[in-house]
C-alpha cells in the first residue's frame, strides 16, 4: 500500500515537472547576477549616447563621429548580450523587471555627465526602485514552463500569441509610418511605444534562440528544424534591434535621457511581460501570494521612477526643508 502510494506520488511529481523545469540554485544566482550587471550597463547607455549627441551638436558634426556615443552603443551591445545569457538561464519574468536597476543608475550618472538634477525625492526614488526590484526577485517564478524546441514551436503557433503579434505589427506600422513622422519629435510616447512594442519580438526571440540552440548543440534528431527556427528568430531579433536602435537615438535627440529611460522601462517591461505571459505561460506557476508580491514590487519600482522624473525640476533639499520647519516653529 505504502509502495503504491509512493509510486503514485512520484508519478504525479514527474507529471508536474514536465510542464515546468526549475533551474539549479547556482543557475538562478548566475542568471540574476548577469541580469543585474546588464541592467546597470543598459542604464548607462542612454546617458552616454545622449552625451555623445550633445557633444556632436556643439561641434556641428554627426554623432556617429563621437567616441562617447560609440561607447554608449558598445555598452548597449554588451548589455543585450548579458540579457541574452540571463534569459537562457532563468525565466523572462525574473530578468525583465530587473531593468529597473538601470533607471536610478542612469539618473545618477546623468547628474554627473549631463548635469541633470537629482534632488532628495529623486534619491528616494532610486531607493524605492532598488527595493521594488528585490521584491520582484523574491516573488518571481523560478521554474521554466517551456524547456524544449518542440514546446516552443507549439507555443509560437498558438492562435492567441499569433493574434497578439498581428495586433503588435499593426500598431507598429501605424506608429512608424503615420504617427512618428508627424508627432514623434514632440511626443515622447511615440518613440517609446515603438521601442517597447518591439520588445514583444526581441525578448521572446532571445529566449527562443537559447532553447533552439540547445537542440542544435546536442545534435538532437530535431536539430535541423531547430536550426531553421533559430535562423528565423535571429532574423526577427536583428530587425527588431535595428529598428529599436534607430528610434532610441531619435528619442535621445529630442528628449531628456533620464525621462526617456524611466518611461521606457515601465512601458517596455509591461509589454514584454505581457508577451512572455502569452507565449511562455510562466505565470501559470505563480501562486496568489507571489503574484501580489510581484504586483507590489512593480508598483514600488514605478513609483520610484515617477519620483525620480516628475519631481526632478523641484529645487529643494533637506537643508531648505529644515529651515522652513524652523520658521514655522
From Swiss-Prot:
Family, as annotated: Belongs to the NIPA family.
Pfam families, A to Z: Mg_trans_NIPA
Principal cellular location given in the protein's record: membrane
Membrane topology note: Multi-pass membrane protein
Clinical note on disease: Spastic paraplegia 6, autosomal dominant: A form of spastic paraplegia, a neurodegenerative disorder characterized by a slow, gradual, progressive weakness and spasticity of the lower limbs. Rate of progression and the severity of symptoms are quite variable. Initial symptoms may include difficulty with balance, weakness and stiffness in the legs, muscle spasms, and dragging the toes when walking. In some forms of the disorder, bladder symptoms (such as incontinence) may appear, or the weakness and stiffness may spread to other parts of the body.
Gene Ontology BP annotations: magnesium ion transport; transmembrane transport
Listed name of the protein: Magnesium transporter NIPA1
InterPro entries for the chain: Mg_trans_NIPA
Subunit structure: Homodimer.
SUPFAM superfamilies: Multidrug resistance efflux transporter EmrE
Organism whose genome encodes this protein: Homo sapiens
Alphabetized UniProt keyword annotations: Cell membrane, Disease variant, Endosome, Hereditary spastic paraplegia, Ion transport, Magnesium, Membrane, Neurodegeneration, Transmembrane, Transmembrane helix, Transport
Tissue expression as described in the entry: Widely expressed with highest levels in neuronal tissues.
Topology feature Cytoplasmic, residues: 49-66, 110-117, 181-183, 246-259, 312-329
Taxonomy, superkingdom: Eukaryota
Purpose: Acts as a Mg(2+) transporter. Can also transport other divalent cations such as Fe(2+), Sr(2+), Ba(2+), Zn(2+) and Co(2+) but to a much less extent than Mg(2+).
GO molecular function: magnesium ion transmembrane transporter activity
Residue ranges crossing the lipid bilayer per the database entry: 28-48, 67-87, 89-109, 118-138, 160-180, 184-204, 225-245, 260-280, 291-311
Places the protein is found: Cell membrane; Early endosome
Record-level GO cellular component terms: early endosome; membrane; plasma membrane
Catalytic activity as recorded in UniProt: Mg(2+)(in) = Mg(2+)(out)
Extracellular side, ranges: 1-27, 88, 139-159, 205-224, 281-290
Amino acid at each position: 500500500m505504502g509502495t503504491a502510494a509512493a509510486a503514485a506520488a512520484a508519478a504525479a511529481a514527474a507529471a508536474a515537472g514536465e510542464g515546468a523545469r526549475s533551474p539549479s540554485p547556482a543557475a538562478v544566482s548566475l542568471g540574476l547576477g548577469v541580469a543585474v550587471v546588464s541592467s546597470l550597463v543598459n542604464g548607462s547607455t542612454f546617458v552616454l549616447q545622449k552625451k555623445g549627441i550633445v557633444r556632436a551638436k556643439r561641434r556641428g558634426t554627426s554623432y556617429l563621429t563621437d567616441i562617447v556615443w560609440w561607447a554608449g552603443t558598445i555598452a548597449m551591445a554588451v548589455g543585450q548580450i548579458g540579457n541574452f545569457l540571463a534569459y537562457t538561464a532563468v525565466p523572462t519574468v525574473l530578468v525583465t523587471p530587473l531593468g529597473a536597476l538601470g533607471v536610478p543608475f542612469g539618473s545618477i550618472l546623468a547628474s554627473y555627465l549631463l548635469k541633470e538634477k537629482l534632488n532628495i525625492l529623486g534619491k528616494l526614488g532610486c531607493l524605492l526602485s532598488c527595493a521594488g526590484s528585490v521584491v520582484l526577485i523574491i516573488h518571481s517564478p523560478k521554474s521554466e514552463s517551456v524547456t524544449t524546441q518542440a514546446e516552443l514551436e507549439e507555443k509560437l503557433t498558438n492562435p492567441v500569441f499569433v493574434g497578439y503579434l498581428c495586433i503588435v505589427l499593426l500598431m507598429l506600422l501605424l506608429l512608424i509610418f503615420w504617427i512618428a513622422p508627424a508627432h514623434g519629435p514632440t511626443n515622447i510616447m511615440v518613440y517609446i511605444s515603438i521601442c517597447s512594442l518591439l520588445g514583444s519580438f526581441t525578448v521572446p526571440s532571445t529566449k527562443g534562440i537559447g532553447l533552439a540552440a540547445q537542440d542544435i548543440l546536442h545534435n538532437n534528431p530535431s536539430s535541423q528544424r531547430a536550426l531553421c527556427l533559430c535562423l528565423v528568430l535571429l532574423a526577427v531579433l536583428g530587425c527588431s534591434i535595428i529598428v529599436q536602435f534607430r528610434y532610441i537615438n531619435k528619442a535621445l535627440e529630442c528628449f531628456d535621457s533620464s525621462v526617456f529611460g524611466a518611461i521606457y522601462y515601465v512601458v517596455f517591461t509591461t509589454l514584454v511581460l505581457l508577451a512572455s505571459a502569452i507565449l511562455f505561460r510562466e505565470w501559470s506557476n505563480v501562486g496568489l501570494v507571489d503574484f501580489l508580491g510581484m504586483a507590489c514590487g512593480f508598483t514600488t519600482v514605478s513609483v520610484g521612477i515617477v519620483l525620480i522624473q516628475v519631481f526632478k525640476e523641484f529645487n529643494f533639499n533637506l537643508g531648505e526643508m529644515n529651515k522652513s520647519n524652523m520658521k514655522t516653529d
